[in-house]
Amino acid sequence: NYVLVNADGAKVIDWGTDRVLDLNAIKTTKIQVVDTWNHAGYFENSFYTEAFQQVLLAESKTAYQVKSPKQVTHIFRVKSPLLSKNQVICLSGSFKDAENWSETHLFIMGKSASSPFFELSLNLSKDQFPIAYKYGVYDLELKKLIQFEAGDNRVLHHPVIKDQITIV
């Protein structure tokens, strides 16, 4: 967990215990992690409690496997607990392989049944940074994008560095 120490010395610990990196699974000499604070008061955290995960949302979980490129420069990880059955997270953006936001070139994110994270490995070595991107909801049964997340585009300022993987 992350710990925020305020100017007065008071400590605030972020919520959750699911942010784990398996360093043995990452084949590189350098790792850069770009993460966000998870405040305990965020209402979304209630959907990761045992009552929701084991009972109320158990039927809606969809596991999905994706292939990784031979060379990986960036790994995107995101959680989304309130998807319907057969829905997964996808990613699109201004990078080359997404064909500049094309809805026919979406990147479907993989998810194992035991993990709360959707994950996608990409090779962005031929792209210009910064890169704009968004997550979306994709229906595997309908084979189409349902919607992109609301709000401004996310921006990735972390370019490819030799022998480094960036985890977002």
Where are the model-predicted features located?
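A short, amphipathic beta-strand motif
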Residues: T73-K79
